[in-house]
């Protein structure tokens, strides 16, 4: 295998995915950036090229398992057989009262946010197993701490991501593969431009895409303490860390009351 590490990122054309692609490129990775937005991928590749680093980009609909497998295989071949990091970032977010959102829209959110992760994990596994010290990073959310009103379906998809992360970190540990999840709160990206809920009003939208990208890089190469404790979930930002800690040590009834009050603010 080549000495240069590689990272495959879904949803890489914009927002968190793009910031993460650039961050890993600046840290010497061969970057695989995949998305349905071919035009923005071209500009991402140009930007990485300007950094003097290498990018491989291509169209990818994460809900298509065959295309996902094809793109992962193509990238690993281009990266000389390595897949050091797999980042399942692609996702959408629908906000509003559950009954006001069309059922077809709910289904699409489930397809992208859950089936897209399954497709990525399944396609990446043989390459991760063949690459010593490989890591999977799944983009979950602080909404996987407790179900969020006006984000009910989205929150449910992120609980799925949380669960599959925990399970596969145990299953794949025998192959030396770490599986971790990021838990950001609201992030200033195009996905949240039109989102207005009780919790966005009470907590604000404070994180940037770069905040998440920086923490993803740290999660891939964690501190000795995080490595010793085998940290699986990484809340991003002060608010998410506070919420995660409070939920861990508070009784369920108190956590529910706190979330209800935030949603009604």
Give, region by region, the residue ranges found by the protein language model.
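Residue(s) in the substrate-gating loop at a strand-loop-helix junction
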Residues: 141
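Conserved glycine-rich cofactor-binding loop
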Residues: 13-14
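C-terminal helical subdomain
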Residues: 181, 201-241
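The beta1-alpha1 cofactor-binding region of Rossmann-like NAD(H)/NADP(H)-dependent oxidoreductases
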Residues: 38-39, 59-70, 103
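Substrate-binding pocket helix/loop in short-chain dehydrogenase/reductase
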Residues: 97-98, 102-108
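Active-site helix of classical SDR
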Residues: 121, 157
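Conserved glycine-rich Rossmann-like NAD(P)H-binding loop of the short-chain dehydrogenase/reductase
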Residues: 29-43
């Amino acid at each position: 295998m080549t000495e240069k590490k590689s990272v495959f990122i879904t949803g890489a054309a914009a927002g968190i995915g793009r910031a993460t692609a650039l961050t890993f490129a600046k840290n010497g990775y061969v970057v695989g950036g995949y998305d349905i937005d071919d035009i923005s991928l071209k500009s991402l590749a140009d930007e990485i090229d300007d950094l003097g680093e290498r990018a491989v980009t291509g169209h990818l609909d994460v809900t298509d398992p065959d295309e996902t497998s094809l793109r992962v295989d193509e990238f690993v071949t281009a990266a000389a057989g390595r897949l050091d990091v797999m980042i399942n970032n692609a996702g959408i977010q629908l906000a509003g009262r559950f009954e006001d959102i069309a059922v077809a829209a709910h289904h699409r959110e489930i397809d992208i946010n859950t089936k897209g992760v399954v497709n990525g994990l399944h396609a990446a596994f043989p390459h991760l197993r063949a690459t010593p010290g490989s890591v999977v990073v799944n983009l979950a959310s602080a909404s996987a701490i407790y179900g969020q009103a006006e984000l009910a379906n989205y929150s449910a998809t992120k609980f799925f991501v949380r669960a599959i992360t925990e399970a596969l970190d145990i299953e794949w540990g025998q192959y030396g593969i770490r599986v971790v999840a990021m838990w950001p709160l609201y992030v200033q990206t195009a996905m949240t431009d039109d989102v207005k809920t009780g919790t966005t009003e009470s907590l604000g939208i404070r994180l940037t895409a770069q905040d998440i990208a920086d923490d993803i890089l740290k999660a891939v190469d964690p501190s000795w303490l995080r490595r010793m404790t085998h940290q699986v979930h990484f809340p991003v930002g002060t608010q998410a860390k506070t919420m995660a800690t409070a939920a861990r040590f508070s009784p369920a009834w108190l956590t529910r009351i706190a979330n209800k009050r935030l949603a009604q603010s």
